[in-house]
């Protein structure tokens, strides 16, 4: 038996809901395994429209957004590079990396590079002069790269909106270190698009703030914390001084300004209760 995760986009934090699916693994047949995964999903929900987002997908729109096919434009090499290649080439290990030379290599050669498995523990990612952590959100860098690529190439992203679930047969728990999970990244993108939040993809920090940071609940009054801080405090009303105790003006001909009691009478306003 094997387990894969099905990812469902949602139009609000955290933009993706995950559901593990168990199925019988058939060795050496990715497409049969994909069919088994989808059949397992449809046994509980036959109306789910699911897309496999890997190079083994039978659906052209799914193959087009696999990490081996989906491209990200990098100014540093002045070309479009497969997401899987960017992800591997930017890894920084204890004893090596990043391996910028891999950015211009074909994906099969990249994944066979022994440096990716013999350089010690993965510490972080480094891309075009910027550093990205592996903790506390170990999948966030891959997901951000994937979403950036979809935003750069909207013709690849548009067909995804027709699906409400995604799978990635390559994204087993023991292989995520090397491949990432395209199904989760695709679901997050669709969720962000539905919520009108694609602008958060423009920077890694904004992406983390939107996708990985749970929104604070509003106060019970319904006002946000910021709005509450902006509301000025109301001072206690000043004690009213009797009219006969008010200081008299030096100029007897000066205009007399009515006090509060007189103003109420003049304007015929009801007194506050």
What positions do the PLM features span?
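A structural signal for the main folded, soluble domain(s) of proteins
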Residues: 3, 33, 44-50, 76, ...
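A contiguous catalytic/ligand-binding core that recognizes phosphate-bearing ligands
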Residues: 64-66, 77-152
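A short mid-domain helix/strand-loop element embedded in enzyme catalytic domains
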Residues: 147-170, 182-184
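Long, well-structured alpha-helical subdomains associated
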Residues: 201-234
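Short, extreme N-terminal leader segments that mark the start of a protein/domain
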Residues: 1-55
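Compact, well-ordered interaction domains used in eukaryotic information-processing assemblies
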Residues: 50-52, 57-71
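Active-site nucleophilic cysteine motif
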Residues: 175-189
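Long, low-complexity, intrinsically disordered segments
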Residues: 244-273
């Amino acid at each position: 038996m094997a387990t894969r995760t099905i990812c469902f986009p949602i139009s609000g934090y955290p933009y993706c809901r995950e559901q593990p699916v168990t199925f019988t693994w058939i060795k050496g047949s990715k497409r049969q395994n994909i069919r088994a995964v989808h059949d397992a999903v449809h046994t509980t929900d036959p109306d789910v429209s699911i897309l496999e987002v890997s190079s083994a997908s039978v659906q052209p729109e799914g193959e087009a957004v696999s990490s081996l096919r989906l491209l990200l434009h990098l100014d540093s090499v002045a070309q479009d590079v497969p997401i899987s290649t960017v992800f591997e080439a930017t890894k920084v290990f204890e004893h090596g990396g990043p391996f910028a030379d891999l950015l211009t290599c074909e994906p099969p050669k990249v994944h066979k590079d022994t440096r990716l498995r013999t350089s010690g523990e993965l510490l972080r990612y480094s891309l075009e002069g910027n550093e990205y952590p592996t903790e506390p959100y170990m999948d966030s860098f891959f997901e951000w790269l994937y979403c950036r690529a979809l935003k750069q190439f909207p013709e690849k992203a548009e067909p995804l909106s027709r699906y409400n679930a995604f799978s990635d047969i390559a994204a087993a728990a023991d292989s995520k270190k090397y491949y990432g999970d395209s199904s989760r990244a695709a679901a997050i993108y669709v969720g962000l698009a539905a919520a009108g939040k694609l602008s958060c993809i423009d920077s890694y920090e904004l992406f983390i703030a939107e996708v990985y940071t749970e929104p604070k609940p509003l106060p019970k009054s319904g006002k946000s914390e910021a709005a509450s801080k902006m509301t000025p405090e109301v001072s206690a009303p000043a004690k009213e001084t009797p009219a006969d105790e008010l200081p008299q003006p030096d100029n007897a001909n000066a205009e007399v300004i009515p006090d509060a009691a007189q103003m109420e009478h003049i304007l015929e306003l009801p007194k506050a209760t």
